[in-house]
Every structure is written in C-alpha cells, then in structure tokens.
C-alpha cells in the first residue's frame, strides 16, 4: 500500500470506538512498520495559553489567536502525557520532523516557548498523546471500512473549527457525513 503520510483519516459513522468516533486524524507517519497520527478535532478543554502558564512558559507575547481560546487537542490514546506541536515549517526548534507539504512535527519544549513569544509558527496545533498503529493494523482497519482517507490540507488543519472538521472532511469527498451508511456490505 502507498504511504498515507500527510493524509487525513476520517472515521466512518460505523466506527463505534468511544475514542475514535467522529474523529479526523492527521497521519504524521505511515510506512511498513506502522502509522502515527494526531486527532485534530477533539479539544481537551484546556486553552493553549493556560497550558503555557501551567508550564511556567512566557505568555506576555501570546498572539491574539491564543488569547481568543486556542484549544489543546486530545491527540490520541497513546502517551497522553506527551506533547506534540503540528505547525507550519520553520526550522528553529530541536526535535522537529519535516512532514512535507510545509508542515513539521515538534516535540521539544522550545516550540512551546516560541508560541508564547514573537517566534511562534504562523499556524500550529498543540496535542497531548497520539494515535498509533502497528504493522498492517491501519491497512486492516481501512479494509474493514473503518476510515476514509483524503490528502491533508492546511485549511482543515488550521482554519476550520474543531467541531466542524469531521463534517468538512466528509464534504471534501463530495457528500455529507449523514449520507454514509453505518454498515458495510457487498454488492
């Protein structure tokens, strides 16, 4: 199977897993060893500004976007105490991985310090935890019709409200989510 890195997974309505129901996941990695991604539409109920304050990081230069309530996301059920920042490419920080399409994933504290300063990435998401799949696990879930896939785009990542991302991702395929059957079958 071709790599789905830099794609979105859209949960099918039939996916009744309590964590993954109605999720959109950005796939950061996908290869023969497995896959890793971040859920981009499940806020934790913590504002990024509050997280920075809890970590004793500077907030005096926090952008207007943060002041208006940018949310920390529940990135997935794995390592929920570990932070990830998905952001537009800027080569300033340690522990950054270039993902393609002008995106980077950074796991170091210095990017959070930058978010509270004038060196913030242009656009970013902060998530705790990630979604992970072992070898062939994601491929099996795709064969089981648990997920739809579309190429990732910056607008869905950064410009659409969290609560609208699942619907908007479905619309990008040319239909509304309610039009999807909750059951898979054979013709």
UniProtKB/Swiss-Prot annotation:
Signal peptide: none annotated. Pfam families: DUF179. GO terms for cellular component: cytosol. InterPro entries: AlgH-like. Gene3D superfamilies: VC0467-like, VC0467-like domains. Transmembrane segments: none annotated. Belongs to the UPF0301 (AlgH) family. PANTHER family: UNCHARACTERIZED PROTEIN YQGE, UPF0301 PROTEIN YQGE. NCBIfam families: PRK00228.1-1 (NF001266). This is UPF0301 protein SO_3346. The lineage of its organism: Bacteria, Pseudomonadati, Pseudomonadota, Gammaproteobacteria, Alteromonadales.
């Amino acid at each position: 199977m071709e790599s789905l890195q830099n794609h979105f997974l859209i949960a099918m309505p039939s996916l009744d897993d309590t964590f993954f129901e109605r999720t959109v996941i950005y796939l950061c990695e996908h290869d023969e060893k497995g896959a890793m991604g971040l859920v981009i539409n499940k806020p934790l109920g913590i504002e990024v500004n509050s997280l920075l304050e809890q970590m004793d990081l500077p907030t005096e230069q926090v952008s207007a976007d943060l002041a208006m309530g940018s949310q920390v996301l529940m990135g997935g059920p794995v390592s929920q105490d570990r932070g990830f920042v998905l952001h537009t490419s800027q080569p300033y920080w340690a522990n950054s991985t270039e993902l393609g399409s002008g995106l980077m994933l950074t796991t170091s504290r210095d990017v959070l310090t930058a978010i509270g300063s004038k060196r913030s990435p242009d656009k970013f998401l902060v998530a705790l935890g990630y979604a992970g799949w072992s070898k062939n696990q994601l491929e099996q879930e795709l064969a089981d019709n648990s997920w739809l896939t579309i190429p990732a785009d910056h607008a869905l990542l950064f410009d659409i409200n969290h609560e609208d991302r699942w619907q908007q991702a479905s619309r990008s395929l040319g239909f509304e989510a309610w039009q999807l059957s909750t059951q898979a079958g054979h013709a």
